[in-house]
């Protein structure tokens, strides 16, 4: 049965979700704050407005009367989703989940205080003075982040008290929404970090994808690979934590649950997103029998999901813009990437550039049992051949 889906946020993840939805005969209205966003290029209709404007959001919902609302970004007046859900519209995964996960304070307190998950030690700060006091308790180095942000915006690794004032201002500048409050956490000496894609269903058990390893810079994803080779006991603990936190947040869909892994100290819950995850773009290489976007769509629609299996190993590496321009971006080097075997190039179709904006991704694959480190190197080398200008 065809459903009308209102997609809030139309970036590269939303684009892949729309493609999955269209393959199942769904009708999608893609929304974002700027025209020509990637998901708009493949949707049935689009709307351009600020999703932080609650009245504008209500007006778009009243106009299109969707069956399902699928948030793809954090910059949404999320409290409006509660009353839309009460009116009978399915919010993905749930209004509760979207509200909790867009605010690091809400999700961290739920995880650490209510559910008892192991997390980094943390405090909140509403002023520079509070930040300085918290840093004395935690020590250095420490991590400072806005309560509301994405893709590493406003995040700093602070190594001394002299850097706190700069971190305060940078955090406030990178904050989304109206709240100017930061979270300060101890820096975990981790050996690796993973994303555990977790699928909650309307009428089925919670499922887990093979763990995805990833490398970040400035809090933003640069490369990912699957499967991450981790201690089996660490994987069990991560699955236990992911199951617990997603059950508490309620709803059906895919979740990107992030963890720090330490050989010495075990598994730490970091954060989660109630939607397809950027590190999960590696699944576009066919690493699983169902990629993360197909899994999200099936969970949203209540369609059956078979056992998730690892079909082959994969790696992804991002293509960043070295410039900021309102002109349409151009690309060089695509031909070189296309010469590579078992390699896919994805240009997202963003209409303009920002410095270090993610403009595309290269994904590579190889048979199970192949050298994953060599595949990662191949993927990064291929991505480096693409120039944005």
Curated annotation (Swiss-Prot):
A GO BP term, please?
Answer: 'de novo' IMP biosynthetic process
- Enzyme class at the top of the EC tree: ligase
GO cellular component terms attached to this protein's record: cytosol
Q: Which positions fall inside the ATP-grasp domain?
A: 109-301
Ligand binding (ATP): 104, 145, 150-155, 185-188, 193
- Matches recorded under InterPro entries: ATP-grasp (IPR011761), ATP-grasp_carboxylate-amine (IPR003135), ATP_grasp_subdomain_1 (IPR013815), PreATP-grasp_dom_sf (IPR016185), PurT (IPR005862), PurT/PurK_preATP-grasp (IPR054350), PurT_C (IPR048740), Rudment_hybrid_motif (IPR011054)
The UniProt record gives the binding positions of Mg(2+) as: 258, 271
Q: Where does N(1)-(5-phospho-beta-D-ribosyl)glycinamide bind?
A: 12-13, 72, 278, 350, 357-358
Q: Which residues cross the membrane?
A: none
Key words of the record:
ATP-binding, Ligase, Magnesium, Metal-binding, Nucleotide-binding, Purine biosynthesis
Reaction(s) catalysed by this chain, per the record, are:
N(1)-(5-phospho-beta-D-ribosyl)glycinamide + formate + ATP = N(2)-formyl-N(1)-(5-phospho-beta-D-ribosyl)glycinamide + ADP + phosphate + H(+)
GO MF terms here are:
ATP binding; magnesium ion binding; phosphoribosylglycinamide formyltransferase 2 activity; phosphoribosylglycinamide formyltransferase activity
Keyword Metal-binding annotated:
yes
Q: Which NCBIfam families match?
A: PRK09288.1
Its family remark reads: Belongs to the PurK/PurT family.
User: Subunit details for this protein?
Assistant: Homodimer.
Q: What does this protein do?
A: Involved in the de novo purine biosynthesis. Catalyzes the transfer of formate to 5-phospho-ribosyl-glycinamide (GAR), producing 5-phospho-ribosyl-N-formylglycinamide (FGAR). Formate is provided by PurU via hydrolysis of 10-formyl-tetrahydrofolate.
Protein's name according to its UniProt entry: Formate-dependent phosphoribosylglycinamide formyltransferase
Q: What species is given as this protein's source?
A: Phocaeicola vulgatus (strain ATCC 8482 / DSM 1447 / JCM 5826 / CCUG 4940 / NBRC 14291 / NCTC 11154) (Bacteroides vulgatus)
